[in-house]
């Protein structure tokens, strides 16, 4: 099994965080999230796919990952290119923004892979935050939009034996200031939390219909 992590260029990263974090801060947020993800991957070989040279260099030096320079725009195209350039058939696709994933999640996937053709974990917004394929061409990739349901439909249409891996920690992807709050609650001892704390970011509880907490930043 090999892990593929597709990563967007730094200048397009996490624009919904732009009012809360500068472009430079968003870059280092990403790099710290990648470190947390890599620490969960046990000894699995990892490939990072990106158009961004800085990300590719970081992946080589800091993550000990193989790298692929993305040729065409689009998440599906990037992953398909990785499929073409790697020899392994068993694939685990993980996004770059799920820093709460842990070793035991990966161990679960490895164990489940003995029994299923496809394993999929949804994001909170209906996307796909983890996708295992017994063979890399089992389904047509349908990332973007509500990809979780699209991938399930692909599996059903092809009569694949699949498993829905329903994990809150894996479902948390970081796109908005509110998402950062989950890092403070659930991300103890992560690189991501330590980085956010170094920026003066903190969380206050908020018991109302408007949410569980408020994410703030010290002046």
Curated annotation (Swiss-Prot):
This enzyme's EC code(s): 2.7.7.68
Catalysis performed (reactions): (2S)-2-phospholactate + GTP + H(+) = (2S)-lactyl-2-diphospho-5'-guanosine + diphosphate
Pathway assigned to this chain's UniProt record: Cofactor biosynthesis; coenzyme F420 biosynthesis
Keywords: GTP-binding, Nucleotide-binding, Nucleotidyltransferase, Transferase
GO molecular function, one term: phospholactate guanylyltransferase activity
Entries under Pfam families matching the protein: CofC
Domain of life: Archaea
Keyword GTP-binding in annotation: yes
Keyword check for Acyltransferase: no
Enzyme class, spelled out: transferase
Gene Ontology biological process: F420-0 metabolic process
Function text: Guanylyltransferase that catalyzes the activation of (2S)-2-phospholactate (2-PL) as (2S)-lactyl-2-diphospho-5'-guanosine, via the condensation of 2-PL with GTP. It is involved in the biosynthesis of coenzyme F420, a hydride carrier cofactor.
Annotated family: Belongs to the CofC family.
Quaternary data: Homodimer.
Protein's name in the database: 2-phospho-L-lactate guanylyltransferase
Organism: Methanocaldococcus vulcanius (strain ATCC 700851 / DSM 12094 / M7)
Gene (name only): cofC
């Amino acid at each position: 099994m090999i892990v593929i992590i597709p990563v967007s260029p730094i200048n397009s990263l996490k624009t919904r965080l732009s009012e809360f974090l500068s472009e430079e801060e968003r870059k280092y947020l990403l790099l710290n999230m990648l470190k947390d993800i890599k620490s969960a991957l046990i000894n699995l070989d990892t490939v990072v796919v990106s158009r961004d040279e800085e990300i590719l260099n970081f992946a080589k030096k800091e993550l000990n990952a193989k790298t692929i320079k993305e040729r065409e725009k689009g998440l599906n195209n990037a992953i398909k290119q990785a499929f073409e350039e790697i020899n392994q058939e068993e694939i685990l696709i993980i996004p770059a923004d799920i820093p709460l994933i842990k070793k035991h999640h990966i161990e679960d996937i490895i164990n489940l892979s003995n029994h299923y053709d496809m394993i999929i974990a949804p994001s909170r917004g209906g996307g796909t935050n983890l996708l295992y394929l017994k063979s890399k061409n089992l389904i047509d990739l349908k990332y973007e939009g509500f990809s979780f349901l699209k991938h399930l439909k692909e599996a059903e249409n092809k009569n694949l034996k699949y498993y829905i891996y329903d994990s809150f920690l894996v479902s948390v992807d970081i796109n908005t200031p509110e998402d950062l709050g989950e890092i403070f609650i659930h991300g103890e001892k992560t690189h991501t939390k330590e980085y956010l704390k170094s920026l003066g970011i903190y969380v206050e509880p908020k018991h109302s219909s408007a949410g569980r907490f408020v994410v703030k930043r010290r002046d």
